[in-house]
A protein has these predicted regions:
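Ligand-binding pockets and gating/stacking loops
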Residues: 1-157
Length: 157
């Protein structure tokens, strides 16, 4: 609720919300181990099951945030319509510490939703291209961001 209220009242335009319980055992039913140890699961089914429970709980919180933003009516739409919400991880496979093929979700902000964009797994598109697209959507005149090579196609509604 605090994030929604801060955005709704224009108290801030940027929020970072960390849902990680990285070095502690999270308060998630069925989880007995701390998150970091579980990410090095070695393909052990019990560890993967606990990690899945943690990720499901995190996505539940993310979904609740999106719902709250979507239910907050503003002139011309909802708070979600004018808010970019990015959810992701710095690792594509924490078990091997791979930073390739990151799982990233983008919601709101006038982007085209309800689909899935996939990119060449061997010739990765830089994540910075997504950030470049997000900047352009905010009205920043930038051809690219940081180590990006441009922007992402297929995001615009």
């Amino acid at each position: 609720d605090l994030v929604r209220l801060a955005l709704q009242t224009d108290s801030t335009r940027v929020v970072t919300l960390t849902l990680s319980t990285f070095s502690v055992v999270p308060h998630v039913p069925g989880v007995k181990n701390e998150t970091h140890g579980l990410t090095h699961h070695g393909n052990e089914p019990d560890k993967i099951a606990e990690l899945r429970r943690i990720e499901e709980a995190q996505l539940q919180v993310f979904g609740e945030l999106l719902a709250a933003l979507g239910e907050t009516r503003e002139t011309g739409g909802s708070l979600l319509d004018r808010t970019q919400v990015l959810y992701g991880s710095c690792l594509g496979n924490a078990n091997s510490h791979s930073n390739q093929n990151l799982p990233i979700l983008l919601a709101g902000g006038g982007f085209r939703h309800g689909g899935h964009l996939a990119f060449d797994r061997t010739n990765n598109t830089p994540l910075a291209n997504l950030f470049g697209s997000m900047l352009q959507d905010l009205g920043v005149e930038a051809d690219r961001f940081a180590t990006g090579t441009g922007t992402l196609r297929g995001l615009r509604s």
